[in-house]
């Protein structure tokens, strides 16, 4: 009977350790996904900012060309 108790406790202990390791890995994966999502958002914001800057620069250049063309 004592052998069965020890075996049962060993199985339960190993199961709990395995479950704990799986939960830890799951948390790490979730954190990595959150980090990936945040970096994608930053990348998207940076891209939009560059597009806006490019648009403003293009408009300024076009305005300068129109001004120069109007003076001649």
UniProtKB/Swiss-Prot annotation:
State the organism named in the record: Agalychnis annae
Family designation: Belongs to the frog skin active peptide (FSAP) family. Dermaseptin subfamily.
One of its Pfam families is DD_K
Query: Which biological process terms from the Gene Ontology are attached to this UniProt entry?
Result: defense response to bacterium
Signal peptide span? 1-22
Q: Which InterPro entries match?
A: Dermaseptin_dom, Frog_antimicrobial_propeptide, FSAP
**Which residues are processed away as propeptide to yield the mature protein?**
23-41, 71-72
Any idea what job this protein has? Possesses a potent antimicrobial activity against Gram-positive and Gram-negative bacteria. Probably acts by disturbing membrane functions with its amphipathic structure.
Which tissues does it occur in?
Answer: Expressed by the skin glands.
Biased-composition ranges for Acidic residues? 30-39
Q: Tell me what this protein is called.
A: Dermaseptin-A4
Residue ranges for the region (Disordered) are 24-43
- This protein's UniProt keywords: Amidation, Amphibian defense peptide, Antibiotic, Antimicrobial, Cleavage on pair of basic residues, Secreted, Signal
Q: Which residues carry this modification: Alanine amide?
A: 69
Compartments reported by the entry: Secreted
Quick one: where is this thing mainly located? secreted
Superkingdom per UniProt: Eukaryota
Q: Which GO terms describe its cellular component?
A: extracellular region
């Amino acid at each position: 009977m004592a052998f069965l108790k020890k075996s049962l406790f060993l199985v339960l202990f190993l199961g709990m350790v395995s479950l704990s390791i799986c939960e830890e890995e799951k948390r790490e994966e979730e954190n990595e996904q959150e980090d990936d999502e945040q970096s994608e958002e930053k990348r998207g914001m940076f891209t939009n900012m560059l597009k806006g800057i490019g648009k403003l620069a293009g408009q300024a250049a076009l305005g300068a060309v129109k001004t120069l063309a109007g003076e001649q």
